[in-house]
């Protein structure tokens, strides 16, 4: 789906109409995901991971066990990677595709502001990714009820942190997408940044600055997604959530201003 921008002679500004257009962009993006292969591929990957972990516990372990947190930990330890893959698929190409395909000059019913395009695409990628996160946690919670027979409240804290981490990663994905010229390059760089680059920067900071607790780094804060499920670890859930949200807001704002300055 392609979108256009308001022409220079159009001075009217209707906030409600801009939100309506953003909603249309969001629906079109989600429809595009559903009709394409990305949604199917990621759904299959998510189902495969759940199946493999469950099979491994059944065949080589003690089944689902009797401890809800231990069981949750085994499934949630892959969550950061799942979010990373989802952001690479759904967020990293959202903005760059408009420039790469040269389709953003096409109008649907009337011109549309760039911020409506940005907001619609951001919400679409966020909703799809968070949707998968919720489904994944719902399955884990169900397995906890089937196996141990109860659900510890820590898993809901972990869920909240996973949603915050998704938001933070989406901001990074859009930031990279706003300056790239090719979708493939944007996807690779997004994956590399979230999987390796931030961790490399984290290591340098810890060594060079002698900082033992770099709580302000996005990927470091993501550790609390698991730590809240492990009584042997010290988790700072509120701080981690704040760090993730700040990363998401800051990177999203920067990516919007970069996107707004680019010409279609």
Locate each region found by the language model.
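Short hydrophobic, aromatic-rich alpha-helical segments embedded in or entering the lipid bilayer
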Residues: 21-24, 209-230
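Aromatic- and glycine-rich beta-strand/loop motifs that create alpha-glucan
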Residues: 2-43
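Junction motif at the cytosolic side of a transmembrane helix
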Residues: 2-6, 246-264
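Hydrophobic alpha-helical segments typical of transmembrane helices
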Residues: 91, 102-103, 221
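Secretory targeting signals
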Residues: 13-15, 43-94, 118-192, 198-199, ...
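A cytosolic-side transmembrane-helix exit/cap motif
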Residues: 155, 174-177, 204-214
């Amino acid at each position: 789906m392609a979108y256009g921008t308001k022409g220079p002679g159009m001075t009217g500004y209707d906030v409600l109409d801009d939100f309506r257009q953003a909603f249309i962009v969001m629906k079109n993006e989600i429809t595009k995901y559903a009709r394409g292969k990305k949604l199917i591929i990621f759904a299959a990957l998510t189902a495969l991971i759940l199946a493999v972990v469950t099979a491994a516990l059944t065949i080589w372990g003690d089944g689902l066990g009797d401890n809800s947190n231990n069981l949750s930990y085994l499934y949630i330890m892959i969550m950061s990677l799942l979010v990373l893959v989802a952001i690479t698929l759904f967020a990293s190409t959202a903005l760059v595709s408009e420039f790469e395909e040269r389709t953003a000059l096409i109008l649907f019913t009337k011109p549309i502001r760039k911020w409506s395009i940005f907001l619609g695409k951001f919400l679409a990628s966020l909703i799809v990714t968070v949707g998968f996160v919720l489904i994944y946690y719902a399955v884990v919670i169900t397995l906890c009820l089937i196996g141990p027979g109860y659900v510890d409240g820590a898993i809901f804290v972990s869920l909240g942190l996973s949603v915050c981490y998704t938001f933070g990663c989406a901001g990074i994905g859009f930031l990279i997408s706003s300056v790239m010229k090719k979708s493939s390059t944007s996807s690779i760089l997004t994956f590399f940044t979230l999987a390796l680059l931030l961790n490399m920067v984290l290591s340098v900071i810890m060594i060079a600055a002698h900082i033992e607790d770099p709580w302000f780094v996005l990927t470091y804060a993501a550790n609390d997604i698991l730590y809240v499920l492990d009584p042997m670890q010290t988790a700072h859930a509120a701080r981690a959530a704040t760090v993730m949200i700040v990363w998401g807001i800051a990177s999203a704002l920067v990516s919007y201003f970069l996107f707004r300055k680019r010409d279609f």
